[in-house]
């Protein structure tokens, strides 16, 4: 494609009156929709009544469109187009479309030049209109194609004249026989008579068929009217069983209402039962969980008490050897200082006698309380009561000792601090 061809094409299309502005950049790349639009417009310029499919969405539609345009131009304008270049829709397609536009543009220029030579004023008043001459151009193209076809047929027939001349001459020179001619004429007349009789029979059959069809139609109409009247009668008359039917229908409706109500109640009760089971299950699970928690708590408390009991046993085991050791020391030192064992009688000035011991670790109540604590660690209240009893006994012993300390003489006063000192060490 050259720049000159593209420029000439755009100028010719503008001169022919193409409504769209064509740029030189439109054909740098394939643009099939624009090429299809231009080809349709050019075909309409040749023949406005020509119908060409404008669907070019698919590949097959485009091929069919290009073939239709090329065939039209070949038969009407005697212009041979390259289908491959038209399908490319680029600069090479412009060369093919330039063939069509050149014919139209030259015809327009020739008409303008002829009109300008005759009368420039008339040309200025009446503009050249190619559209008004399209019908004449169409008729001329059609006549030209018919003349060409008939001329070709005539040429073929004239070519067969040499072969048919001898047969025609022999047929003309042969004398006609009356018998054969009469026989042929009678055969022809007989054939014509048979065909006429057959046609009459067909006409008679048609008339009879028409009469039978009319009779059938009339019969059907009568049946239809009779059935309509019967239908109206049946609709107007109330059946004898209608009362019973209505009564049964009412009973059935009541039964259905009762069924629906009972079904709803049953559904509601089932739902309530399910809710109750669910609540009971939740309560059971909560109770089981609480029981497990209490069991775990009791186990932990038991473990804690066992640990505390073991600790107290260890403490008591540690304290007992110390007491034994202290007792042994006291036994060893009995010769050095006097010692008053349990239940000893201390004489005073007034002759009062006190029975008891100042050693808290040697009391029976203290031993019993220690045994109770070691054996039953779970009962904290009992331990507290025993501790209170121990404290009360110790207080009573101390009070009794204090009462006796004021009455005895110096000898007793000298011994009393030793006993208190030993008891303090024992505690």
UniProtKB/Swiss-Prot annotation:
Please name the InterPro entries in this protein's record.
Clusterin-associated_protein-1
Chain positions covered by the region annotation Disordered:
300-427
Assigned keywords, A-Z: Cell projection, Cilium, Cilium biogenesis/degradation, Coiled coil, Nucleus
User: Which residues fall in a coiled-coil region?
Assistant: 202-307
Basic and acidic residues composition-biased segments: 300-313
Known function: Required for cilia biogenesis and maintenance in the kidney, the lateral line organ and eye. Appears to function within the multiple intraflagellar transport complex B (IFT-B).
* Consequence of gene loss (knockout): Mutant animals develop ventrally curved bodies visible at the end of 1 dpf, followed by bilateral kidney cysts in the glomerular-tubular region detectable at 2 dpf. Cilia in the anterior pronephric ducts are already visibly defective at 1 dpf and by 5 dpf, cilia are completely absent from these ducts. On the other hand, cilia from the posterior pronephric ducts remain unaffected. Cilia biogenesis is also defective in the retina, with the outer segments of photoreceptor cells having modified cilia. No visible cilia in the lateral line organ. Pericardial edema is also observed at 5 dpf.
Q: Which Pfam families match?
A: Cluap1
Q: Where in the cell is it found?
A: Nucleus; Cell projection, Cilium
Protein name per the record: Clusterin-associated protein 1 homolog
- Composition bias of kind Acidic residues appears in 314-332, 363-400
Q: What protein family is recorded?
A: Belongs to the CLUAP1 family.
């Amino acid at each position: 494609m050259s720049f000159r061809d593209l420029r000439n094409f755009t100028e010719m299309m503008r001169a022919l009156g193409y409504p769209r502005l064509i740029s030189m950049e439109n054909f740098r790349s394939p643009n099939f929709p624009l090429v299809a639009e231009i080809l349709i417009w050019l075909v309409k310029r040749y023949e406005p009544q020509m119908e060409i499919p404008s669907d070019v969405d698919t590949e097959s539609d485009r091929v069919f469109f290009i073939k239709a345009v090329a065939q039209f131009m070949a038969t009407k304008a005697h212009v041979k187009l390259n289908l491959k270049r038209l399908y490319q829709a680029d600069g090479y397609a412009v060369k093919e479309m330039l063939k069509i536009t050149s014919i139209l543009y030259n015809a327009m220029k020739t008409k303008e030049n002829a009109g300008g030579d005759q009368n420039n004023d008339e040309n200025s008043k009446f503009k050249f209109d190619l559209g008004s001459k399209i019908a004449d151009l169409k008729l001329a193209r059609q006549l030209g194609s018919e003349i060409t076809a008939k001329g070709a047929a005539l040429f073929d027939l004239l070519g067969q004249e040499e072969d048919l001349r001898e047969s025609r001459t022999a047929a003309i020179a042969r004398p006609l026989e009356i018998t054969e001619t009469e026989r042929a004429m009678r055969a022809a007349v007989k054939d014509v008579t048979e065909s006429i009789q057959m046609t009459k029979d067909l006409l008679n059959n048609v008339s009879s068929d028409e009469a039978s069809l009319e009779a059938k139609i009339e019969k059907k109409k009568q049946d239809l009217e009779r059935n309509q009247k019967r239908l109206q009668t049946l609709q107007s008359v109330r059946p004898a069983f209608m009362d019973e039917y209505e009564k049964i229908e009412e009973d059935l409706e009541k039964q259905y209402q009762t069924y629906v109500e009972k079904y709803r109640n049953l559904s509601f009760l089932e739902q309530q039962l399910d809710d109750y089971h669910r609540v009971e299950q939740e309560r059971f699970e909560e109770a089981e969980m609480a029981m497990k928690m209490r069991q775990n708590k009791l186990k932990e408390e038991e473990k804690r008490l066992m640990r505390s009991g073991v600790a107290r046993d260890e403490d008591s085991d540690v304290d007992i050897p110390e007491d034994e050791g202290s007792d042994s020391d006291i036994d060893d030192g009995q010769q050095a200082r006097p010692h008053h064992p349990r239940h000893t009688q201390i004489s005073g000035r007034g002759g009062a006698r006190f029975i008891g011991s100042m050693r808290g670790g040697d009391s029976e109540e203290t031993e019993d309380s220690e045994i109770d604590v070691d054996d039953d660690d779970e009962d904290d209240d009992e331990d507290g009561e025993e501790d209170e009893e121990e404290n009360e006994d110790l207080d009573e012993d101390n009070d009794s000792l204090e009462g006796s300390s004021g009455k005895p003489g110096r000898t007793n006063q000298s011994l009393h601090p030793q006993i208190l000192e030993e008891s303090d060490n024992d505690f």
